[in-house]
Design a protein with these regions (language model features):
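Flexible coil/turn and secondary-structure edge motifs
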Residues: 1-152
Length: 152
């Protein structure tokens, strides 16, 4: 699901979040079966799916609401995230410093309905065409085994 997390404003709307004053980041909630995929793999996908060295920016979008942030629900998840960042840093995967925030998830707020399934419902949107599709196509090449057969 698309939504917002990491800020102070209760029940934020998209128009509040894009001001950058709520403290929330645009986020997704991932519901998964740990018997099928583990949290560590999801973290690998997270880091492979965006540029974690960009401060307050993803694609053409700028502002604190577009920051790279990984949320955890327990100390084990926190350690997995921190260990992965350490591994990427040690291996010099990126030429710049990783700026991803690692924060406890206090509350996830669902975004408005028109933000859900955005790619499917807006296939000709310029962000979808210029940012999302290229990321997905790269992922299909690098990690095809992680895609559901009925998706994309």
């Amino acid at each position: 699901y698309s939504g917002y997390a990491g800020g102070k404003t209760k029940n934020p709307t998209y128009y509040q979040v894009i001001t950058g004053k709520t403290g929330h980041a645009e986020t997704v909630e991932v519901i998964y079966d740990p018997e099928v995929i583990d949290f560590a793999t999801l973290i690998e996908v997270f880091f492979d799916s965006h540029d974690p060295t960009l401060l307050n920016q993803q694609g053409p979008d700028r502002g604190t609401q577009y920051r790279s942030v990984a949320f955890y629900q327990n100390e084990s998840e926190k350690k997995i995230i921190e260990d992965h960042i350490s591994k990427l840093t040690k291996e010099k995967t990126y030429s710049k410093k990783i700026v991803t925030e690692v924060k406890p998830l206090s509350k996830f707020y669902y975004a408005e309905n028109y933000h859900q399934d955005y790619e499917k419902n807006n296939p000709n949107d310029l962000y979808i065409l210029n940012v999302s599709k290229p990321r997905l196509n790269k992922f299909k090449v690098t990690s095809p085994e992680l895609l559901k057969k009925e998706q994309h």
